[in-house]
Structures are given as structure tokens and as C-alpha cells.
Amino acid sequence: MKHSNRTRSIDLRPLGAGLLALALALPGVANAQEKDSFRIAWSIYVGWMPWSYGDSAGIVDKWADRYDIEIDVVQINDYIESLNLYTAGEFDGVTVTNMDALAIPAASGVDTTLPIIGDFSNGNDGVVLKGTDDLMDIKGQRVNLVELSVSHYLLARALESVDMTERDVTVVSTSDADIVGAFSSEGVTAAATWNPQLSELRSMPNASVVFDSSDIPGEIIDTLALNTEVLEANPDLGKALTGAWYEIMARMSSDDEVGIDARTRMAEAAGTDLSGYESQLASTQMFYDAADAVDFVTSDQPEDTMENVRQFAFERGLLGATASSPDFVGIEFADGSVLGSEDNVKLRFTSEYMEMAAEEAL
């Protein structure tokens, strides 16, 4: 099975200032103008495969034509590279988790809006131990994971749930490509990762998932992010992408031949089969209905989640060397409230476009 490219980690301490300078120097990022051609970057992950299908099935083009614009949906093989390219202004939008949206473009000064909340991980990310099914037994162990990733965040939340901290374990930085091989070796007894690697780890002898993202529902969120200035100058981009997304959702969530074909094509594009893809969907809380996504983004959940995320990011230097507190980057929510600096809002949750979809107003 091909491993997911949803690597979702980067050490931004030496990178943030350079990305900020580059982003501000590029046209199309600062002082965005009205235009009719756009580029969206996506990478392989269960919740983002709909963009592959929407592109190949002509759904994105159909909705772009409706608003008399062009949208080029581009697969980037490396997730972090896609975020760096977006942050540098080479793309108008990108598929991204909530944590990385804060830690990469927002922390680098690129004002970013999340018009589509696609899903949240509901078991796709987990902590695995050998020889025990009790999370308490993690104390004193070496835990292999992709450092500064959502797996690292998940470990921190797992430890917090049993009144421990990272001082009670030793984090061993391990790439997502190496995590399965590492865990299969005799000397490795603990790991944190995401699917499809997680499914491989849990199937190994004497291995148990002792904590997963279903224990913190709604905290690892998968989104489509757009440059705020580009979106404000070109609201038809948000309308076209949202319209396309929910047409794709309607197709892939159906049990008829159209739905099976859509999920099969997504599976093939992800390097797996229909069964493998559907097993990943089973641990993903997809928002197939726009109204459900609106309910989620207008609830208290995003603010509660981002409080945890920004503390994690600040404590590990992900908000940049100049950040003196977690308040450095302001985060705006659907009701207009702001967490952090109101003078430096760089990440925005919104229900505007999903509400249009729910009301069939696109």
C-alpha cells in the first residue's frame, strides 16, 4: 500500500522569516487584484482525494465555467512543499490541516481563510504501544513519530489525558516513510502516526492503539485554505470551489454506481483499492452535508481546538522566533471573535461559503 503524503510537519524556526519576506515580495499575495485564473494545490490524503476526482471528472471545471473563471487543481507530491509553495504565493489555495495552516502560512504572515471544512480525523491518527493496551504504560518509553507534526500534537494530548507531559517520554524523530519499518523492529515499542501507516502498525503482533484522534474529536481538521486577499478580491473563486466540493460530496457519499465509481477513482489516485480507501473513510468524519460543516465551524469546537493548537505551536517555536506568546498570530472565528492579536489576524475560519452551499445559493 502506498503511504500517504500527508506528512504535515516542518521546523519553521529558520524558515518563517524567509517565507514571509518572499511572500510579501510576490505579486498576487500582497495587494491581490481581481483575476480570472487560479491555482489550487492538493496532496494525497483520504479527505483530500475528492479534489483529484473533482478535477478528473470535470466537476471543478464545470463550476469554474459557471463563474467564468479558470481553476487549475494541481497535485503536489510532498505535503509540506505544497504549503511552502502556497505560502510563497505560487498557489492561491492549498489543502491543509488546521495546525499547519496556523504554523506555516499564518505564522509566516500570509493571511489565510478556511472556506471549506472538509472533515476531521476520527481515528485516522493514533498512538500505538507494544505489549500493553494501557496508555499509562507509555511512561519512560521512546516514542517514534514525525516531530512537530499532528502526530506530535496527538501524543501531547494523549499524555495530557493521563496527567503526563513530554518529560515522561522521549520523542524519537522518525519520518512517515520509516515509521512502519521502525515499529517492526524489536527495539521500538511506541509510536504515533496516521493512516495508512497506523493500520499497518496496529496489525503487528502485540500492538495496541492506546489513544487515537477519536479521543479528541474535532481537533485534527482537514480544510481547503485560500489566500484571504485573493478570496476577498475574487469571491467567485470561493463560490466555485465550494459548489464543486459539495457536488463531489454528494457523489462520493452515495451507495449507487456513481458513488462507488467516485470512491474507486479516489482510491486508485491514492494508491490503494476501494476497500482500503473506505477503511480510511471509516475513521474520518467527513462533512458530506454543507449544513453539518456549518454547524461545526459555528460551534465552540474550533476555538477550543485552536487554543490547544496555538499553545502547542508556540511552545515548540512554530510561530516564529519573534513570537513572544501564543497571542502573536490572531485567529478569527466564524462569529467574528478573535483568539490572540486582533492587530495580526492571519488565520480565519468562516461559514460564509458553506452556508451558501447549504442554502443552495451558489
Sequence positions of predicted segments:
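Conserved C-terminal helix/tail region of periplasmic/extracytoplasmic solute-binding proteins
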Residues: 309-362
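Short, glycine-/small- and polar/acidic-enriched structural segments
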Residues: 33-173, 182-185, 189-195, 218
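Signal peptide processing junction and immediate N-terminal pro/mature segment
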Residues: 28-32
